[in-house]
Amino acid sequence: MFCSLSISRFVSRKTITSSSLLSRSFRFLLSVDSPPHIPLLRPSSNTLIPSSSFSRRIWDSCSGGGGGGGGDDYDHIRSDVNCPRCSAQMHVIFSNRPLSLTAREPGIYQAVNFCSQCKTAFYFRPFKLSPLQGSFIELGKVKGTDDDHDDDDDDQKSFPRNWKIQGLRSDEDGEDADEEEDESNGGDKEKQSVIKLPTPKEICQGLDEFVIGQEKAKKVLSVAVYNHYKRIYHASRKKGSASESYNIDMEDDNIDHVELDKSNVLLLGPTGSGKTLLAKTLARIVNVPFAIADATSLTQASYVGEDVESILYKLYVEAGCNVEEAQRGIVYIDEVDKMTMKSHSSNGGRDVSGEGVQQSLLKLLEGTVVSVPIPEKGLRRDPRGDSIQMDTKDILFICGGAFIDLEKTVSERQHDASIGFGASVRTNMSTSGLSSAAVTSSLLESLQSEDLVAYGLIPEFVGRLPILVSLSALNEDQLVQVLTEPKSALGKQYKKLFRMNNVQLQFTEGATRLIARKAMSKNTGARGLRSILESILTEAMFEVPDSITEGSQSIKAVLVDEEAVGSVGSPGCGAKILKGDNVLQQFVEEAESKEKSKEDEAKRAQSM
């Protein structure tokens, strides 16, 4: 089994780190005839397995064709371990037979074995047999294997060369792919390592549960993310089996050899419109690592600040220090409009976070192998050194920014702006009753790449962000929905916070609308809602915890009505604290009656 195996890439590296984990997961069996300390590999970042976990096992000697390796004699030693991925018991056979995996270095004991439970193969690099030191390297998923690998005879069989990288499955594979997976997994669907890739409609439905409005942006992002991970899946499938055919009628047989480039995304919209939430929710739906970076903190190399490689380190940490998982993640770079050449040309100093940072980001966006340094105080030191190699060709980069006054650039390009004061297009739209936000949204719908270049981004940077998504400012109705409807709505969050103290929080309809109007007046979008709620509920949150011991006079409910909110230009009296039983309904009815009377008076005043 050792001679015939040839692996082209590693999926992930799992290093033995925890003594408690080792004593639970690894039971090593040593020979009675073996010397106590046999160096197997050159010393590296070794980790000690406690000697209490050792048992003994007789050495086996394999000669002739005993391992499929000619007529030379090779030593073998067997150990029983628990799989690092699924904890199922598996056999590991160490041998000094040369492997193609390690350049056929002679005299080195090593092992490549397969877990029948999770269909994963591991290459074990021991540095000493007693005490056992080394690390597991996960090679990948194996297709077309039998479940019965517990017998000693199976340990001597050759591994199949048809490797399947863990990833995503698209619906286009149909029933053939399902049958193939069932066969490779022994018919047990719970063991399937390939998860289904959601369709664009399913992704959009997932976004609807958390994000209000921005319907066009949701569709564009859903298609972009689906195509990105479909591209990754088909690329990994093609690598997994060069002999696979996709059973698709194609006019051009050479289309199988076409390489698909990734398409990164640029989100444009005012603050509080949902750019960050959209990117974060997308990563949650497709279940990939997600990292956020602020472009304003990035600087050129050798300057004080964060290098662009720090973005990849954040993604590496979010992926649980798994390089392979990180290489399929999503990175959101916020405030990219702040690193335009225009914003730094007026400073008079060196442009350390403008065009230079854009140049540094080009290779990351396009796709390249980057050496990512590990900080000295990092969460986990990589055993291979002070840096890791990450390939960014499958990382989806989503950039975002407010791009203030970009609509003026669009208007000038359309020759609708007059020299000096005013613009005819804005005048026409304003006289038609459209708000300023509606005017901006209408202009940005016709945004082109040349407008971003005129704004201050370099052409090479814009060219690597082919998908442009414009978001509009949220209106009053949408802000009310943000407060009440999504799964993680702000109103629901504060209700849960008070419920932890057995207190009921209630908002009247008039109060929620007034809160939305106050947020719109601050031009902060949905971000302004939390600060408004904090100011309204601060006094109640201060009083509630101490009222638990007051018995029947303890606080039972907190009411937020229009009086608590105040007006658009002035603060209110704060949330009303209600004590005693059965008082909330009475106050709610009174508050709603007052609000209805005010609405009726306002309507009568407008009609006169």
UniProtKB/Swiss-Prot annotation:
GO terms of biological process kind: proteolysis
Residue numbers binding ATP: 270-277
GO cellular component terms, A-Z: mitochondrion
Any one Gene Ontology molecular-function term assigned to this protein's record: ATP hydrolysis activity
Compositional bias segments (type: Acidic residues): 172-185
Protein localization: Mitochondrion
Family: Belongs to the ClpX chaperone family.
Name the record gives this protein: CLP protease regulatory subunit CLPX2, mitochondrial
Protein species of origin: Arabidopsis thaliana (Mouse-ear cress)
Gene: CLPX2
